[in-house]
A protein has these predicted regions:
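C-terminal motif of bacterial Sec signal peptides marking the signal peptidase cleavage site
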Residues: 16-18
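Conserved HGGG/HGGXW glycine-rich cap/lid loop of the alpha/beta-hydrolase fold
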Residues: 60-116
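Active-site loop/oxyanion-hole signature of alpha/beta-hydrolase fold enzymes
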Residues: 108-149, 153
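Conserved hydrolase catalytic core segment
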Residues: 144-187
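Flexible "cap/lid" loop of the alpha/beta hydrolase fold
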Residues: 173-213
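Alpha/beta-hydrolase
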Residues: 202-280, 284
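Conserved loop-alpha-helix segment in the C-terminal half of the alpha/beta-hydrolase fold
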Residues: 276-318
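Catalytic active-site module of serine/aspartate enzymes centered on a nucleophile-bearing elbow/loop
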Residues: 310-342
């Protein structure tokens, strides 16, 4: 074949390949209506706005941010902690828009850009369930379109919400949260802690006994020996900026009151929470996301799926923040689940 023919053939091949790629990308891209901001009062603020909710102690304002337009599927993101802002879930922005998912970042009361009344009387599960319901109404969510994705504490809250209001839900995603705090604590004590350097573990437990968990020495021990192993599996110096921003802006008092001083088990108000036997009452489609190296027992998470009448399991090769550790699996499974419902 002459050099001219070879060039022509190559050009034709590139043209065909390019057309196929464009067609594929076009098929995968969200429709133009996804970017339609008609009728949205938040169009001038990039989707962000404040909404007012009622509480037993009076009205408060919450920060929410809408991304996309899809009246058939509205996904509300519930952050973990308790006490973390929406910042660490900004990773969703790299994946969900391409799938045409309308979703909402949301700072719970006492976190991020929302009001921080610093009132422990408001730190109860029933009140937070009511808060989520008020946010649902504010974004126009109902049984035809409303889905919750709760990560960690947000997963606990999402389970509680579904048990109270699944008649207003289309689907549920439980990300990295066991349905029992006692079982979560057992996994830490009986499985994860025995694998640690026992001298380091003793130092950590000794600090906890003294109550001096706010001292740098405590986190200096936890970070390489627990957080880098089970929370986000890379050196802390390489943690993504959104995660660091969420940590820096964390409501520590809220966190310690509800969870305890660290991620090495729970000792706060949530210590006796257990809903495993109630999972069978959640009849909407539910995706359970579990990380191999998480502080949440993968075998227990698989058992949760068996309890859920319409449960599905997404097992990742990551830790507690597997939306960073194993993005192909996390977002591949999440988007496939949501697309079936869209």
């Amino acid at each position: 074949m002459s050099r001219t023919l070879k060039l022509a053939a190559s050009a034709a091949l590139l043209l065909v390949t390019g057309c196929r790629r464009t067609e594929s990308e076009s098929a995968a891209a969200p429709p133009a209506s996804y970017y339609d901001n008609s009728g949205h009062s938040d169009a001038w603020t990039g989707g962000a706005r404040k909404i007012t909710i009622s509480t037993p102690k009076g009205p408060h304002q919450l920060w929410i941010k809408r991304i996309g337009n899809n009246p058939k599927l509205k996904l509300l993101l519930l952050t973990g902690g308790p006490g973390l802002s929406h910042a660490y879930l900004e990773v969703m922005d790299s994946y969900l828009p391409g799938a045409g998912v309308e979703y909402y970042h949301y700072d719970q009361l006492e976190t991020g850009e929302s009001d921080r009344p610093n009132d422990p009387d408001l730190w109860t599960l029933p009140r937070y369930v009511d808060e989520v319901d008020q946010v649902r109404k504010a974004i126009g969510g109902d049984k035809s379109n409303f889905c919750l994705l709760g990560h960690s504490w947000g997963g606990l809250l999402a389970m509680e919400y579904a048990l109270a209001h699944q008649d207003q839900m289309k689907c549920l995603v439980i990300s990295n949260m066991m349905a029992s705090i006692p079982a979560y604590n057992d996994y830490a004590r009986k499985v994860l802690e025995p694998k640690m350097n026992q001298a380091v573990l003793k130092q950590i437990l000794d600090i906890e006994k003294t109550g001096k968990t706010e001292q740098p020495a405590y986190m200096n021990l936890l970070m390489p020996n627990w957080y880098e192993q089970h929370i986000l599996r890379r050196p802390a110096a390489q943690w993504p900026e959104p995660v660091l921003r969420a940590e820096e802006n964390m409501n520590r008092k809220f966190y310690v009151t509800m969870q305890g001083p660290s991620e090495m088990g729970a000792s706060g108000r949530l210590v006796n929470w257990d809903r495993f036997n109630d999972l069978k009452r959640i009849t909407i489609p539910t995706l359970v996301i579990s990380g191999k190296y998480d502080t949440m027992d993968p075998a227990y998470m698989a058992a949760m799926v068996e309890q859920l009448p319409r449960g599905e399991l997404a097992a990742t090769n990551g830790g507690h923040m597997d939306m960073y550790d194993d993005q192909p699996t996390y977002f591949g499974k999440l988007i496939a689940f949501l697309k079936k419902l869209n």
